[in-house]
């Protein structure tokens, strides 16, 4: 009996990792009916991460009333894994762009609901929180999340307030003395796949602000306010966070979770591999089948395919990447431990056209892959 580990990322804009896992499983079992299949849909911290972790690890989804990014009450959620002490939270579930319903306001959106979800998960028994950054509507260092967890933000008169992106310039002092004691002893791991600093031309405001509705003047104000926040953090908390890799993720939420929650930032794929116990699954495996929508030079920077290849390389287990688009620089993946790259593109067409047949093209590529596997197996 052969053993296959299926660990695809989503094909952005076409198929989720859950869908791809299912298609891989169906194709594999058609050609290798007695195969042992380990399906692990990959989460990257953005939308769909809770469902992916629950599918891989078991557990259940918990619905929680919380504050949305525009301060209206919404129904948020998190996933409590089967171990009973690990919770997965998507920042986007309480502070995501879609929740703004087209009314983008980078200077006025809040992450308060994210803090409420963290508290709810801890009260539910979680001692380890996996927080996914991605799809955020906010741009102010996650101060609202911290405020929901008891961190106090004070203006020049000593009055407490909950900052947003447009009011960070009023901030004079940060008081951590009332931070919720429920956080004590809780490990918070933040999934972060970008290395942007907090401020400057590569910072949160300049790179991500426009997609949240910020025009050039607003980008300048937001960047100035985030720099001010970093100075107050340095003054009151003794932390230098402005230039840390990932500080600018999700509108500066990366900086906020490090400064206010003591969280560590970790590449999303490393979080997934550690949580599912990937290294322990490898012994006896025939191959690992992974994939993503596009493989290029950016894929070498800790993305899903390369993260898996690095782990599997130690055991010399083949890693096959099924991808939508093979771009220049993809061949460097072979030096990182990828055994083969299989493209689903059967004809040269623009992405807008290719996405319409993405499912059929993936199925065709998988059909060829497993036919080839059976041919080699029969020839031995």
Give the positions of each predicted feature.
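N-terminal loops that bind phosphate or other acidic moieties
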Residues: 2-133, 137-380
């Amino acid at each position: 009996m052969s053993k296959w580990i299926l660990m695809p990322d989503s094909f952005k804009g076409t198929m989720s990792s859950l869908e791809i896992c299912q298609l891989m499983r169906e194709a594999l079992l058609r050609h290798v009916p007695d195969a042992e299949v380990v399906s692990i849909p990959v989460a990257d911290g953005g939308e769909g991460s809770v469902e992916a972790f629950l599918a891989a690890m078991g557990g259940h989804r918990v619905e929680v009333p919380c504050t949305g990014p525009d301060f209206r009450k919404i129904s948020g959620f998190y996933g409590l894994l089967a171990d009973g002490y690990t919770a997965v939270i998507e920042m986007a579930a309480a502070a995501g762009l879609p929740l703004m319903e087209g009314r983008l306001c980078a200077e006025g959106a809040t992450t308060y609901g994210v803090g409420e979800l963290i508290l709810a998960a801890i009260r539910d028994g979680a001692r380890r929180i996996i927080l996914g950054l991605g799809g955020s509507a906010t741009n102010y260092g996650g101060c609202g999340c911290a405020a929901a967890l008891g961190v106090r933000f004070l203006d020049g008169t000593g009055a407490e307030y909950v900052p947003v992106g447009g009011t960070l310039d009023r901030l004079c002092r940060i008081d951590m003395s009332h931070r919720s004691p429920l956080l004590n002893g809780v490990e918070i791991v933040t999934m972060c796949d970008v290395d942007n600093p907090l401020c400057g031309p590569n910072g949160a405001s300049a790179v991500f602000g426009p997609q949240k509705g910020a025009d050039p003047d607003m980008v300048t104000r937001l960047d100035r306010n985030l720099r001010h926040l970093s100075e107050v953090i340095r003054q009151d908390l003794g932390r230098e966070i402005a230039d840390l890799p990932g500080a600018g993720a999700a509108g500066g939420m990366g900086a906020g979770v490090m400064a206010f929650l003591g969280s560590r930032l970790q590449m999303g794929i490393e979080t997934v591999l550690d949580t599912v116990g990937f290294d322990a699954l490898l012994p006896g495996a025939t191959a690992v089948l992974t994939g993503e929508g596009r493989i290029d030079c950016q894929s070498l920077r800790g993305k899903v395919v390369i993260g898996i290849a690095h782990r599997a390389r130690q055991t010399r287990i083949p890693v096959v990447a099924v991808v939508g688009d093979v771009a220049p620089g993809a061949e460097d993946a072979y030096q990182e431990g990828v055994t083969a790259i299989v493209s689903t593109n059967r004809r040269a067409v623009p992405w807008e056209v290719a996405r319409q047949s993405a499912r059929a093209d993936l199925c065709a590529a998988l059909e060829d892959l497993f036919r080839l596997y059976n041919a080699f197996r029969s020839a031995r």
